[in-house]
Amino acid sequence: MRDHVAGRYAKALFDLALEHHVLDQAEADVRTLGEVLHATPELASVLENPSISAEELKQVLQTSFTGFNTIVLNTILVMVENDRASEVLSLPEHFIALLNEHRNVATAIVTSAYKLSDEELTNVKETFGQKSGKTLEVENVVDTNVIGGLRVQIGYTTYDGTIETKLTRLERELLKA
């Protein structure tokens, strides 16, 4: 349920930020919110604590995020007023997903046997950016179970060029013959 509700608030925030031409400021504020919530588990606990009143929560949030754009801060406060304080924890993830979709940006998770160099990551970014038609942000995940090659996941699409997969395909072909 949390994801669904947080997604609706994120969409409303995104639409308002776009309409008022403050998308970059909203992005910065929402990223900061996500970082603060991640770095301060105490604040996350406060948001999930039903025994803390909405007024107390609003005071804490207004004090903590005074420099935030009014639209971002008001969205968070409305969530608290509507008894959705715990949903604030998922707001950054949903907002950034909407922003990336709007900007035609996707995350490519590149799994390899070793940490790839910047040059290798740039090559992956360019090659798979062309295939997907998106601007890619690349994350390199090292998996020691990968013998060699790469596995690239962009959204729900996986390009598997690992040696293990190639050997499995070869085995199937040989068994057919």
UniProtKB/Swiss-Prot annotation:
GO cellular component, one term: plasma membrane
Subcellular localization, as worded in the UniProt entry: Cell membrane
Keyword Zinc-finger: no
Pfam families given in the database record: OSCP (PF00213)
Database matches in SUPFAM superfamilies: N-terminal domain of the delta subunit of the F1F0-ATP synthase (SSF47928)
Molecular-function annotations in GO: proton-transporting ATP synthase activity, rotational mechanism
Classification via Gene3D superfamilies: N-terminal domain of the delta subunit of the F1F0-ATP synthase
Primary location class: membrane
Entries under PANTHER family matching the protein: ATP SYNTHASE DELTA CHAIN (PTHR11910)
Role of this protein: F(1)F(0) ATP synthase produces ATP from ADP in the presence of a proton or sodium gradient. F-type ATPases consist of two structural domains, F(1) containing the extramembraneous catalytic core and F(0) containing the membrane proton channel, linked together by a central stalk and a peripheral stalk. During catalysis, ATP synthesis in the catalytic domain of F(1) is coupled via a rotary mechanism of the central stalk subunits to proton translocation. This protein is part of the stalk that links CF(0) to CF(1). It either transmits conformational changes from CF(0) to CF(1) or is implicated in proton conduction.
Subunit-level organization: F-type ATPases have 2 components, F(1) - the catalytic core - and F(0) - the membrane proton channel. F(1) has five subunits: alpha(3), beta(3), gamma(1), delta(1), epsilon(1). F(0) has three main subunits: a(1), b(2) and c(10-14). The alpha and beta chains form an alternating ring which encloses part of the gamma chain. F(1) is attached to F(0) by a central stalk formed by the gamma and epsilon chains, while a peripheral stalk is formed by the delta and b chains.
Similarity annotation: Belongs to the ATPase delta chain family.
Protein name: ATP synthase subunit delta
